[in-house]
Regions:
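C-terminal and inter-domain tail/linker signature
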Residues: 1-143
Length: 143
């Protein structure tokens, strides 16, 4: 598969929550995950199993969320994806009790493919936007 096909399949099967365990077909044994939180970069090492569990945790918190790819660019072994994820706040997260209201997440990542698998990625998530929604929904439920 080409880098484009690998990342598209990753989003269709794994990141979407449709088949998290398919991560073992598309991800290297150890993947460097560079995560931008505010202006601070954190790098963690993820395995396909870890990533599948991460997706299952998202499903527990946000239900069967929708995921829409808004931009998809390929340059050699790197693939850039920007997406919108919409779920329902069903479980406590980040100190916020569930509201049953929608939560929209905007995010983007660059995936690097090596030997036919995702071996590294750099991800940015609009955490401030998510925080604002949690605060707004909390106040809305307190009215």
């Amino acid at each position: 598969m080409t880098p484009e096909q690998i990342v598209r399949k990753f989003f269709e099967e794994v990141r979407s929550g449709n088949n998290p365990d398919y991560s073992n077909q598309l991800m290297a044994e150890k993947v460097l995950a560079h995560q931008i939180v505010s202006e601070e970069e954190q790098t963690v090492c993820r395995t396909p199993k870890d990533y599948a569990e991460h997706v299952r945790e998202m499903i527990e918190v946000y239900g069967n969320f929708s995921l829409e790819i808004q931009e998809f660019l390929v340059q050699g072994s790197k693939v850039y994806v920007r997406w919108k994820q919409v779920g329902t706040h069903l479980r406590e997260t980040d100190g916020y009790q569930p509201t049953g209201l929608p939560i929209v997440q905007m995010a983007s990542a660059v995936y690097r493919i090596e030997d036919g698998k995702i071996s590294e990625y750099w991800i940015q998530i609009d955490r401030s936007g998510i925080q604002n929604q949690f605060d707004f929904n909390k106040n809305l439920n307190n009215i």
